């Protein structure tokens, strides 16, 4: 049987079957369509304006490594006029993050981008290893997710950037939609498919890989021979997200378009006005100045519980009431430095290409 030719150029031998479309295409055409789709995602959503300082959330994994490579290449190819930086968060996970940061440092040299590394220990006075020793593995992802999100904003503020881009892909977003449905989290369900988010006191954050399948990102990294770290977090097997991931993979096996279908369904969800009226208004944390829907932001609440020897007190409202019953926080309580976001300007669209 003769080898199949590329469905796009009709010349070269097909080497890739795209999970998203089922097309069999050659390697060079795969590079072109992958890069062009990311470019069109960026331009159609008006993510950047010329002169923006953009921090790429870099973990050393496949998604962030491919994102850094593609952002640099598209910035040069289409003259976005962006100033790019790598921003890494060191959670303090021995045998995982310390090794992946070595990959990030190599990426810094390979892509010629400035690198900023901010650690949990530096910011919060705790590493994830120390936190897990206190809370166990059941709720550790809650601490890490809250601390990491705020650390990214704080690291970006230190770099004085206008924008953070992360390597969240289509699989990640579809999983998040499923998780929010299973948890009945209306507030997050209403915004989890947004390609770009920004509060009054947070830095603009977006996902250029919103419509890129994880399998295609892996194939891109493989064919481009990119340098990335492939070990999973040692604490992630116990994460709630794992259940949504298994379910999504089963759906994808039966229907490859399930990932994009779920994202489009999530985009179509609208929170009713009467439900919006019951949601908490965003304000500023009284202790650290970060955005919060309560008097104290989640990071400060979790940190206070750790510092007072009641680590799980910040997980639920009931546990928080138990901590409050112990009395006010001591004056010498370790706190997070006050947050001062950089200022940004209005967006001017970068033109799309077909």
UniProtKB/Swiss-Prot annotation:
GO MF annotation list: nucleotidyltransferase activity; tRNA binding
Keyword Iron: no
GO cellular component, one term: mitochondrion
This enzyme's EC code(s): 2.7.7.-
GO biological process terms on file: protein urmylation; tRNA thio-modification; tRNA wobble position uridine thiolation; tRNA wobble uridine modification
Biochemical pathway: tRNA modification; 5-methoxycarbonylmethyl-2-thiouridine-tRNA biosynthesis
Major localisation: cytoplasm
Domain of life: Eukaryota
Subcellular localization(s) per the UniProt record: Cytoplasm
Keywords associated with the record: Cytoplasm, RNA-binding, Transferase, tRNA processing, tRNA-binding
Main function: Plays a central role in 2-thiolation of mcm(5)S(2)U at tRNA wobble positions of tRNA(Lys), tRNA(Glu) and tRNA(Gln). Directly binds tRNAs and probably acts by catalyzing adenylation of tRNAs, an intermediate required for 2-thiolation. It is unclear whether it acts as a sulfurtransferase that transfers sulfur from thiocarboxylated URM1 onto the uridine of tRNAs at wobble position. Prior mcm(5) tRNA modification by the elongator complex is required for 2-thiolation. May also be involved in protein urmylation.
Family: Belongs to the TtcA family. CTU1/NCS6/ATPBD3 subfamily.
Name under which the protein is recorded: Cytoplasmic tRNA 2-thiolation protein 1
Organism in which the protein naturally occurs: Laccaria bicolor (strain S238N-H82 / ATCC MYA-4686)
Name of the encoding gene: NCS6
């Amino acid at each position: 049987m003769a080898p199949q030719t590329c469905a796009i150029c009709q010349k070269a031998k097909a080497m890739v079957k795209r999970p998203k479309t089922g097309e069999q295409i050659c390697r060079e055409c795969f590079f072109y369509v992958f890069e062009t789709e990311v470019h069109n995602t960026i331009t159609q959503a008006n993510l950047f304006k010329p002169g923006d300082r953009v921090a790429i959330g870099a973990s050393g994994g496949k998604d962030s490594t491919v994102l850094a490579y593609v952002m640099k290449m598209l910035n040069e190819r289409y003259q976005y006029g962006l100033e790019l930086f790598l921003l890494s968060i060191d959670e303090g996970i021995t045998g995982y993050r310390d090794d992946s940061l070595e990959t990030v440092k190599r990426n810094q040299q390979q892509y010629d981008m400035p690198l900023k590394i901010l650690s949990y220990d530096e910011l919060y006075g705790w590493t994830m290893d120390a936190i897990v020793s206190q809370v166990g593995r059941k709720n550790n992802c809650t601490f890490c997710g809250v601390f990491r999100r705020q650390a990214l904003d704080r690291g970006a503020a230190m770099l004085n950037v206008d924008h953070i881009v992360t390597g969240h892909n289509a699989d990640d977003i579809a999983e998040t939609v499923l998780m929010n449905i299973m948890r009945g989290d209306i507030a997050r369900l209403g915004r989890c498919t947004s390609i770009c988010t920004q509060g009054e006191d947070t830095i603009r954050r977006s996902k250029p890989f919103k419509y890129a399948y994880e399998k295609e990102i892996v194939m891109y990294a493989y064919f481009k021979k990119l340098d990335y770290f492939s070990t999973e977090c040692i604490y992630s097997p116990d994460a709630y997200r794992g259940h949504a991931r298994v379910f999504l993979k089963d759906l994808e096996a039966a229907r490859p378009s399930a990932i994009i279908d779920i994202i489009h369904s999530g985009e179509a969800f609208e929170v009713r006005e009467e439900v919006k009226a019951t949601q908490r208004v965003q304000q500023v944390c009284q202790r650290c100045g970060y955005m919060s829907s309560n008097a104290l932001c989640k990071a400060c609440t979790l940190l206070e519980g750790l510092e007072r020897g009641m680590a799980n007190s910040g997980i639920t409202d009931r546990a928080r009431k138990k901590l409050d019953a112990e009395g006010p926080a001591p004056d010498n309580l370790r706190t997070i430095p006050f947050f001062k976001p950089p200022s940004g300007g209005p967006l001017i669209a970068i033109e799309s290409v077909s």
